[in-house]
Amino acid sequence: MGSSPSSAPVYLPDSNHERVKILVAGPFGIGKTTMIRTLSEIPSLHTEEVMTDAAAHVDELAVADKKTTTVAIDFGRLTIAQGRIVLYLFGTPGQRRFKPLWSDYARGALGALVIVDTRRLADSFEVMDLIEETGLDYAVAVNQFPESPAYDEETLRVKLDLEDHTPMVICDARDWDSSLNALRALAAHLVTRAGGNL
């Protein structure tokens, strides 16, 4: 289920690419870094640091086996639509202490993909609230973990308090096709919300 290195050039040649900034958001330990690493056609950039006991009082350590955490941002790039559109994927940190930076993260973004985990659905509310405060449209990707409880779509939508028009897909952040499908759901939503004028 892993990804393989791409032959895409690290630098884009000068051309008429449409460049689109997309946020990949979610609470701590949800799979944001994994998804960006999976999708990126270039070596993705990650600002991860080893977690320490000193941070335990600052960050809620909801994921017992997690050893590192994003301390600034993740970045990846994906070219789609036969090279006409370049997606810049920005993974936001999931900890509360980064809340003051959200307006900066959102500046220039077209939309957001919010990753959630059915083991910790309530952890996603703050992130969805932050996205809504920025005015960005978003889609929800339910990242499947082996021990995650399974819910039908209607139950999940109720538990997440999603509006009818907000797309929700099941995905595996480790799988390229599955992660790309989540981005496609977001892209279709953004086109619909813009009245087809993207």
What residues fall within each predicted segment?
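Canonical P-loop GTPase G-domain recognition
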Residues: 146-198
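Conserved residues in the N-terminal Rossmann fold of short-chain dehydrogenase/reductase
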Residues: 89, 142, 170
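Residue-level signature of catalytic and energy-coupling elements of molecular machines
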Residues: 35, 91, 172
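A structural signal for isolated positions on well-ordered beta-strands in alpha/beta enzyme cores
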Residues: 23, 139-140, 169
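Conserved G1/Walker A P-loop phosphate-binding module
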Residues: 2-64, 78-79, 86-87
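Conserved C-terminal guanine-recognition region of P-loop GTPase G domains, centered on the G4
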Residues: 115-165
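Switch II of P-loop NTPase G domains
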Residues: 70-76, 82-113, 117-130
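Conserved NTP-handling cores and scaffolds of large molecular machines
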Residues: 39, 43-46, 135, 190, ...
